Amino acid sequence: AFYNKFYAPNNAVLVLSGDIDVKTAKLLAEKYYGKLKRRETPERLEMPKLEESQRSRIEMSRPQIKGVRVSRNFAAPSYNMAPEYIYALSVLSAYMGEGETSKLYKKLVLEDRKALTVGTAYDPAARSYGTFTISAIPQEGVSPEELLEAVDAAWAEALVQLDNAELEKVKQKM
């Protein structure tokens, strides 16, 4: 049902890589896909605009998983929504939480010993909203709530103390 509903040449993207020129690519695409007829496909649904105050909390557990991970996920601009923010958010993610020299890792893992690990990730590859995620695993004896409070405090502190020289180092690595 899904295939017949959505799979149509007018709703597809053809990706080619390797040692091929444009002329040959067009000939091969026409040979293999040219006979396929255009079909009507359902109109894409647009994501509703998010209210800034929308919040939710989800807790999940599985008997086979003993550890705890806490995450904060934020709606963030995607390539399709606002490409002008992509580089800045990528730099922010690297600066704040990618690797052992990041601000959150230094503060929460090395200094305060609240987390075993902490990291950030920015994913702009979505049709509508992308995501910016901060996740951490608490040290033994640290509750998820305590760790989330520490994450929030470390984030706020790092933003206040933005270091231009360190930001430049992050940019050079990208």
Regions found by a protein language model. Give the residues of each.
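A generic secondary-structure signal for well-formed alpha-helical elements
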Residues: 6, 10, 20, 24, ...
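Short, surface-exposed connector motifs at secondary-structure boundaries
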Residues: 8-13, 88
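Solvent-exposed, non-transmembrane alpha-helical starts
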Residues: 27, 81-85, 143-147
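Active/ligand-binding-proximal structured segments within catalytic/core domains
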Residues: 72, 82-96, 103-106
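Bilobed periplasmic-binding protein/Venus flytrap-like ligand-binding cleft at the lobe interface
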Residues: 89-99, 150-157
